Amino acid sequence: MASMLSKRLGKRSLLGARVCAPTLSGDGMLVDGQMSIQAEISGGFGAGALEGGYCKEFPEDGSCASAMSPTNRFKLYPGQKVYITHNGKEYVGLVEQHNHVDDEVKLFVLELGLHLCRKMEDVRLAETQKPLSSPIEQSLPTSPGATSTSAQRSVSRSIDVPKRRSDAVEMDEMMAAMVLTSLSCSPIVQSPPCTDSIPAPRVTCDLWKEGGDVSDSGSSTTSGHWSASSGVSTPSPPHTDASPKYTSEVFSASHVDEGFETDPDPFLLDEPAPRKRKNSVKIMYKCLWPNCGKLLRSIVGIKRHVKTQHLGDGLDSDQRKREEDFYYTEVQMKEDPEAEPTPKSPSSATAPLLIQPVPAKPETHAIEVPSVESPLSSALSQSAPGSFWHIQTDHAYQALSSIQIPVSPHIFTSISWAAASSTIPTLSPIRSRSLSFSEQQQQAIKSHLIVASPPRPSNGNRKIRGEAKKCRKVYGIEHRDQWCTACRWKKACQRFLD
């Protein structure tokens, strides 16, 4: 039997294997045992611990059988203890008679008191499993159709298994914890409540004024923040009273609104002054056509300017394709920061505004525009920049000539007007400056003299496109190294100026 086990299990050790060996009495009965010592050499003797607490050595030549192997090749003697399965449960029986011809064994089950007849293949010399000693299993009824698996399933009934928690519930708890944490750290919880009684309009105006430089008339240089005296446009939503920036100590002081304010608000003293804008570099596009020098802000506008004003539109569009790329260049212009507005009291604004005319050139002509009741037609703000601002759109060549409204010999503003219709009074400015004087002076002062820039030069003397000499035409494409830098970069030729 040991050789059969070794063939079945390969090179695995036989230690601990359950075997059946003859008893020491020599009556031929096989009893259940377990291998304790294996023979070191093939064909040697191995020791086994048998029932009754004694050990026996037996050779590895088949004198012992596996406890779970069929007993067809062995003879069972009367009174020998065997194990059978009856109604899904294992019972111990005693052999009464072993019939080798029919291969049947007559048994007597002591626990049930029954005489049974079973096939030899259904009889085992050792029990398959230990009997269950738990009271739960003893109380469970056994049905005739039950199998051995029912006993195994009933084992899991006595194990307390906790209920499974879904991942969604755990995620909801995590989200709830995060929400509570964020609420505990919010400014509404941390900041103290405002207990002082403050007029609502005053508080709202103070909140709106935060963050911007306010001019005399109420308009702000920072978009989105307005002063109390400005009610023309829709302001940005004010901050809440629970914001950490505004505490009860700030709102404890009461103020009286007198129209013009000369002193800043108390809560602005602790905050840093608004940062001044540094000199920024603005990229412009300059027309390289002789005696033109037009400056525009977009490349589309300068291309359209060159194409419409200098090259002209005609039928030979294939020859003029992308020709406007040679007649403009990119320049960088420094933009000076705006001068900060200086607050001025009503008493100091009594002097009338004097508009000094600029000496007109011979080609200029004066245009008298009807007085329009708008902030642009009265006066300019004192917060105007100290340098010349050239304000015009990319398509200014399609609009009217730029109109100059001089304020002083050194400070004036050029404003281009978009041609909305043929009549001048219906023109709308592209950009305007807000007023900084009282309404009485705005009604009294009107613009009487507006000097216009010279009209566009006539296109009668300009050369037809294609007649001007270029490095590309003089030297040819094959001698590109002899071209000027402007021609290499597809700009207007600087070597052959016509």
From Swiss-Prot:
Motif position, Nuclear export signal: 171-180
Zinc finger (C2H2-type) stretch: 285-310
Entry keyword Cell inner membrane: no
**What is this protein identified as?**
Zinc finger protein 395
Identify one Gene Ontology CC term for this UniProt entry: cytoplasm
Instruction: List the signal peptide residues.
Output: none
Concerning InterPro entries, the annotation shows: CR1/CR2-DNA-binding_regulator, DUF4772, Znf_C2H2_type
> Where is this chain compositionally biased, Low complexity type?
214-231
- Please provide an example of a Pfam family that matches this protein in its UniProt record: DUF4772
Gene Ontology molecular function, alphabetical: DNA-binding transcription factor activity; RNA polymerase II cis-regulatory region sequence-specific DNA binding; zinc ion binding
For the region Disordered, what residue ranges are annotated? 129-165, 209-245
One Gene Ontology biological process: regulation of transcription by RNA polymerase II
Q: Where in the cell is it found?
A: Cytoplasm; Nucleus
Q: What spans are recorded as compositionally biased (Polar residues)?
A: 130-157
Give the record's keywords alphabetically: Cytoplasm, DNA-binding, Metal-binding, Nucleus, Transcription, Transcription regulation, Zinc, Zinc-finger
